[in-house]
Amino acid sequence: MCAILQKAAQESGLKTKFYFEDKGEAARVAGSFVPCGKLLLLADEETADETLALKETFTDFRVYFAVQGKQESANGLFSLPDDVRAAVAVGGRSIAAARFFCTLRGACLVAIPARCSAAEIFCPRSEGGYPVNEPDAVLFDENFARGRAEGAAVAALSALYAEDIDIDGVFSGARKDAGYEMLRLSASLAVQVGAKVGRAPKESGRRRAGSGERLFESLCLQEIALMACPRLPSRAFYHLLSGKGAPLGECAFAALHYAQARYAALFENGRPRRYFVPDYAARARRAAEYVGEEAFANIKVPSAEECFAAAEIFEESRLHFAAAAEALGAYAEKIRRVYYAEGGKKPLFASGALEEAFSLAADLSPMLSVGALERDLGAVHMRGGAYGAKSGAKF
């Protein structure tokens, strides 16, 4: 188990134990929670064959094997006997379904990701909105899990999320919580995906984490951190892009590079217009289409004194944040190399889609972000509800 990740989980009140081993160890891990009895072995359609091959290793259990189809709900699992005491789920859909099943049945769950993703492991609710428990154990096999390009792009968003917290802290005075340090650590691990880490020398008696394991650790730390700070503007930006149906890796990659370019443009070249007043009501109505009446609480219309104070803080902090944006740009360039080296695809969005989503994201969070500062300070001319500035982002 990774000590850093395990400590972060425990400090966040999570019971999950993490194992970085071959998926063939699933029976042993499950047996450490429940020594025998009836067990559900659940697989996605894509992982069915490899999961079925594990069945013979569960010698101390009576195994019920099932496949979770793409359009199937978890309700079909409740036809299983009431005394199923454990479940092993392989793949994202299976993990989500098994979490719902095990929460209601009081069974323990071992989750085996089939992709470099942690979202389905820590999402607090099922698709139907029911609160679900986290898995008792997560077994990550880096030789089995796919999708490193997507995982690296999503993990790299931790750096962007941390910048959101930094900017809001300076302009609003908000304090940073434990999630901030986790995001910084997550970001540092994300760039190690392409590193040649391999195995430790045999004589050392230690096992060195592979780059896939570090990536998964980064993703888990990000998800744990977001439990403490879920309403980040950059996260809203990413979710708006992913809602357009593009692959998650492409959305994350585009969000990182576009937001960094807007960040740099604001603090390097932005000029506040002290008497500019945006149409807050129109923006709130637009945001309410996505989050309901909550949007009207997110957008706080500043007084003239608050606008002048924000403009002063902007000038005082300009050099600091311009340097931070430059550092984020260097980080994004490292992620670019990792992303394409792992087979990532170039993001393709319709004209204006990035500008529109970035503009709207500022109104979906109560935090003072780059987009919110552009809005409140009138630092960038607005056109048709979207910012008209050229991003300078390079994909």
Residues of each region from the PLM?
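Short hydrophobic/aromatic-enriched beta-strand-loop microsegments
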Residues: 60-65, 108-114, 248
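A glycine/threonine-rich phosphate-anchoring loop and its flanking beta-alpha core
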Residues: 100-187, 294
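ATP/NTP phosphate-donor binding region
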Residues: 1-86, 386
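C-terminal charged capping/lid subdomain of soluble metabolic enzymes
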Residues: 1-4, 8-9, 267-395
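Short beta-strand/turn micro-motifs composed of small residues
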Residues: 42-45, 89-91, 113, 140
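Generic secondary-structure signature for well-ordered alpha-helical cores
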Residues: 10, 140-147, 153-166, 188-206, ...
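Active-site segments that bind and position negatively charged phosphate/pyrophosphate groups
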Residues: 176-320
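Short glycine/serine/threonine-rich phosphate/pyrophosphate-binding segments
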Residues: 49-51, 91-100, 118-121, 234-235
